[in-house]
């Protein structure tokens, strides 16, 4: 059985290295802020924006927004010269699961869980 093209290849991936961080808003923003360096971007949700101290692209406030904005956000990372990206993990249920599936492929399956100690 052959895999469908959507399952075989890394789609819609920017040039930057993407790592998905499975974390709540506080853990995500604290970790990303602690990693500040040239070329670092956050791919975040609207609730994270007030706390980030690095360049970011918000996917929006809910799963529908995230699905709508993901591909444009990935292209924008290239346009803005991102070299490394930490992306907050979307919900793995409902529409969020579709967003997660596209994002995990763009991240070449790089995902880490933050446990409150800011270690990825």
What are these model-predicted stretches?
Residues 111-120:
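Short, flexible loop segments at boundaries between secondary-structure elements
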Residues 3-108, 112:
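A C-terminal functional module that forms or caps the active site or interfaces directly
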């Amino acid at each position: 059985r052959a895999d469908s093209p959507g399952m075989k290849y890394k789609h819609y991936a920017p040039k930057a290295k993407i790592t998905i961080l499975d974390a709540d808003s506080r853990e995500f923003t604290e970790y990303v802020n602690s990693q500040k360096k040239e070329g670092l971007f956050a791919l975040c949700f609207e609730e994270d924006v007030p706390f980030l101290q690095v360049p970011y692209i918000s996917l929006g406030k809910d799963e529908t927004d995230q699905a709508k904005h993901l591909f444009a956000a990935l292209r924008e990372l290239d346009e803005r010269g991102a070299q490394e990206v930490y992306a907050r993990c979307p919900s793995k249920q409902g529409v969020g699961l579709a967003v997660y599936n596209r994002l995990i492929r763009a991240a070449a399956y790089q995902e880490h869980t933050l446990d409150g100690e800011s270690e990825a």
